[in-house]
């Protein structure tokens, strides 16, 4: 296990292991003691104290944003591996594992295929001579093994492509089934509504018949009630008559005749009533009512059919061209969404530079001047604007007069002919970053094949470089005409010298860094780059091109590290997701944080201020025009927002 670890050991890897990724200071056994979070990342104790002081329920890891719920640093364990590497004796032992497996004193140059050992030249000549042993240089053996792995990787990628096609076909089948389910359910609903209409008509007829019976019976009952009331009145009248007789004198009562007949009051009342009785006679269904039944029948679907693939349609919008505006300060009107920067914290400048909103250029679409998820922005010294339009697979070039042209991948050669003949899709240009040097060459990092491509302004590709690049991302142009490219997975910054006729003529490693991504440079050739992976917490579509860094480093043209801006650039402020940078004429650094949705300003002399804090959705690129206007590329708004930027002196803390 130690030998396997030592095979990948180098000075850059040791520096990455022995430095805190936040403050970029080397770990020590005291104040900068390495502490291990629950997610597995290592941070020094000093940075953890700041993280713990600025949170309530724990520490949020700047790498993966997972929360380690602790109340004290004593609850975290030390990274014993890092502490062991700090020991000089242990480090010497690890370096010794990189030597010849036979003598252990010299660097290996040969590889014995028979024994599986890396050997130095004297050991090979002494003990590993043919025919008993087959030896070859280490580089050739490694390249041979890489080719074997590459063939296996190619087969696996073909298999992955086939699996993706089958998954897409299966998704199409699933959507078709869902549509069929919905259609059958709608048909059932129509039939159910028809039955409900029939039931409503039946209920109306039934209630009408019941109302007729109720009316007839009511008439009989009312007539009988009328006769009873008359008889009751007659009875009351007779009662009053007899009461009066009872009160008469004896002589008068006896003198009246007593043979008066008593009237029959109930003679007119009927003895029987003829009414209509009702009852419910059930007709039709004997069992429960059923509208219909779902009938199943077998259906065979070929998952390799092309009909199962989901087709996408893009809506075209009106074209909007970019035109740089010439406006006086009196004509500038601030947008209600873009307010001047306010002071934030005790470290903010007292006289803060104001950036007023001027205009928004472009919208979502595929026509010239429109954008679809733009990810990179670059402005040349002549005022030309280059935009990496990732969603439309192109680079758009604008001049001060408006849209100039677009650059796409123009396939040529026998491979493209074969792909076209077979009906396969041609490779696209998937730009991640773009820049133009002083020679008029346009450098683009392409995520389609993880390469650096260099184009002329006419769209002709003069170079395509993949060697030494694992995942190229950011690119910038030095004043000398060289391109600097960041390799996120390789952890290096590469410097390329490109010739218009010969392509890439020279390349070298400028420096190493922790997952460098976005890059820019000033007029003196100092390169600024982001480090680490800060996740945008509002990345709703899981788009990895919207993830940025959480600290900034710099390196000179000679490879010497310079100014560093750590994760905590202020006492109470930190980076969340750096997605773009640029440098103004004074050497001040301007940073776009897509998670904070703000544009930050870091003067060369120190301090910071917030230039723009409102009106941005997801800023991913910024650049300054020669006329002093600040261009902000808003990815989720699919446009360029233009602000005023005045170069004036002000004091910083």
Curated annotation (Swiss-Prot):
Gene Ontology, cellular component aspect: autophagosome; centrosome; cytoplasm; cytosol; endoplasmic reticulum; mitochondrion; nucleus; striated muscle myosin thick filament
Ranges annotated as RING-type zinc finger: 20-65
Pathway field: Protein modification; protein ubiquitination
Tissue specificity: Spleen, thymus, prostate, testis, ovary, intestine, colon and skeletal muscle.
Residue list for modification Phosphoserine: 55, 328, 335, 339
NHL repeat positions: 358-401, 415-458, 459-499, 562-605, 606-646
UniProt PTM: Ubiquitinated.
This protein's record includes keyword Nucleotide-binding: no
Gene3D superfamilies documented for this protein: Classic Zinc Finger, TolB, C-terminal domain, Zinc/RING finger domain, C3HC4 (zinc finger)
GO BP terms: actin ubiquitination; autophagosome assembly; axon development; cellular response to amino acid starvation; cellular response to stress; fat cell differentiation; free ubiquitin chain polymerization; innate immune response
Keywords from the named record: Acetylation, Bardet-Biedl syndrome, Ciliopathy, Coiled coil, Cytoplasm, Disease variant, Endoplasmic reticulum, Intellectual disability, Limb-girdle muscular dystrophy, Metal-binding, Mitochondrion, Obesity, Phosphoprotein, Repeat, Transferase, Ubl conjugation, Ubl conjugation pathway, Zinc, Zinc-finger
Compartmental location: Cytoplasm; Mitochondrion; Endoplasmic reticulum
One Pfam family linked to the record: zf-RING_UBOX
InterPro entries: 6-blade_b-propeller_TolB-like (IPR011042), NHL_repeat (IPR001258), TRIM32_Bbox1_Znf (IPR047051), Znf-RING_euk (IPR027370), Znf_B-box (IPR000315), Znf_RING (IPR001841), Znf_RING/FYVE/PHD (IPR013083), Znf_RING_CS (IPR017907)
Principal cellular location given in the protein's record: cytoplasm
Keyword Chaperone applies: no
Catalyzed reactions: S-ubiquitinyl-[E2 ubiquitin-conjugating enzyme]-L-cysteine + [acceptor protein]-L-lysine = [E2 ubiquitin-conjugating enzyme]-L-cysteine + N(6)-ubiquitinyl-[acceptor protein]-L-lysine
Protein EC: 2.3.2.27
Coiled-coil region(s): 138-197
Disease: Muscular dystrophy, limb-girdle, autosomal recessive 8: An autosomal recessive degenerative myopathy characterized by pelvic girdle, shoulder girdle and quadriceps muscle weakness. Clinical phenotype and severity are highly variable. Disease progression is slow and most patients remain ambulatory into the sixth decade of life.
Family designation: Belongs to the TRIM/RBCC family.
Complex and partners: It self-associates. Interacts with DTNBP1. Interacts with PIAS4/PIASY upon treatment with UVB and TNF-alpha. Interacts with AMBRA1; promoting activation of ULK1 through unanchored 'Lys-63'-linked polyubiquitin chains. Interacts with TICAM1 and TAX1BP1; these interactions target TICAM1 to TAX1BP1-mediated selective autophagic degradation. (Microbial infection) Interacts with S.typhimurium protein SseK3; SseK3 does not glycosylate TRIM32.
Task performed by this protein: E3 ubiquitin ligase that plays a role in various biological processes including neural stem cell differentiation, innate immunity, inflammatory resonse and autophagy. Plays a role in virus-triggered induction of IFN-beta and TNF-alpha by mediating the ubiquitination of STING1. Mechanistically, targets STING1 for 'Lys-63'-linked ubiquitination which promotes the interaction of STING1 with TBK1. Regulates bacterial clearance and promotes autophagy in Mycobacterium tuberculosis-infected macrophages. (Microbial infection) May play a significant role in mediating the biological activity of the HIV-1 Tat protein in vivo. Binds specifically to the activation domain of HIV-1 Tat and can also interact with the HIV-2 and EIAV Tat proteins in vivo.
Protein name per the record: E3 ubiquitin-protein ligase TRIM32
Gene source species: Homo sapiens
Gene: TRIM32
